[in-house]
Amino acid sequence: MNRTLVILCGGDSSRMGTKKALLPFEDKTMVEYIYDKFRPFFDKIYLSVNERGDLTHLNLDAQEIPDISRNAGPFGAILSCLTMISGDRAFFMSVDTPFMDPRTAVLLYEQSKDYDITTFNFNEACSDTICGVYNKNCIGTLFKGMFFKKVSNSFLQEKCRTNLIETSEIDSISTISMEQQFYKVNDRSSYYYAVFSILKHNFIC
């Protein structure tokens, strides 16, 4: 299998008011929900955290990687993790997208071998979504982008060898729509909606 997953669990969670990773979700926390769902599809799982030890009490078989800088955002977390993972690349996803189907991650992973970045050709509404396979070849570009304070999805995709997969391919491997898979739990109202959707079995994968 030889696949690596990084779940981005850091950030200040200012809109939520508490750590998203530890929000109750079904009978576990949100990060545990994602971990359990993706574990059968990945050999190695890392947790990107603000500080080492943030999620140790969950006793997951996953190595924590603290951010290089607390204020560097998701791209700082990606950079931190790429410098620490054992393999040459990893699939990155945010902890606030718990409805993503693991088969979607596998779809990208299988098409990432000869590229620095493999992600979806998102529409404008999802243009800031962090979801894709990033290779260690991105490290230099990430450093430059952060130094000059202009790092973004568009910046990275322009500077790196990027493979953009059409989102329509999701339909061939998953019964969960793209809109559902990339639904973001980023504030209280979206969290409550997600919890009730689980109870009603609206989002299941």
PLM regions and their residue ranges:
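A short, conserved alpha-helix in the catalytic core of glycosyltransferases
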Residues: 154-159, 192-193
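Glycine-rich phosphate/pyrophosphate-binding loop and the adjoining helix
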Residues: 170-204
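Nucleotide and nucleotide-moiety/phosphate-recognizing core
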Residues: 2-139, 143-150, 158-180
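A eukaryote-biased feature capturing mid-to-C-terminal, repeat/solenoid-rich segments of large proteins
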Residues: 157, 204-205
